[in-house]
Curated annotation (Swiss-Prot):
Disulfide bonds: none annotated. One of its GO terms (molecular function) is iron-sulfur cluster binding. Gene3D superfamilies: Winged helix-like DNA-binding domain superfamily/Winged helix DNA-binding domain. Iron-sulfur cluster binds at residues 56, 61, 64, 70. Belongs to the FeoC family. It comes from Escherichia coli O127:H6 (strain E2348/69 / EPEC). HAMAP family: FeoC (MF_01586). Keywords: DNA-binding, Iron, Iron-sulfur, Metal-binding, Repressor, Transcription, Transcription regulation. May function as a transcriptional regulator that controls feoABC expression. Pfam families: FeoC (PF09012). This is Probable [Fe-S]-dependent transcriptional repressor.
Amino acid sequence: MASLIQVRDLLALRSRMEAAQISQTLNTPQPMINAMLQQLESMGKAVRIQEEPDGCLSGSCKSCPEGKACLREWWALR
């Protein structure tokens, strides 16, 4: 089980990561990592970075049957 400090330190080392990557690296369930990231965000220590839909190569993200599943969400330290 990872701690909040370990999540923060990992973000400091790797500059930005997805929640799934953090979960896999720290061998911690993703819902726990999501909660920790939200806590870091509320403390003003981390920021959520979302890709813009105009970054889609095919330009069809808006009509994609998966919704916005192709848009990635990154986390970084503030």
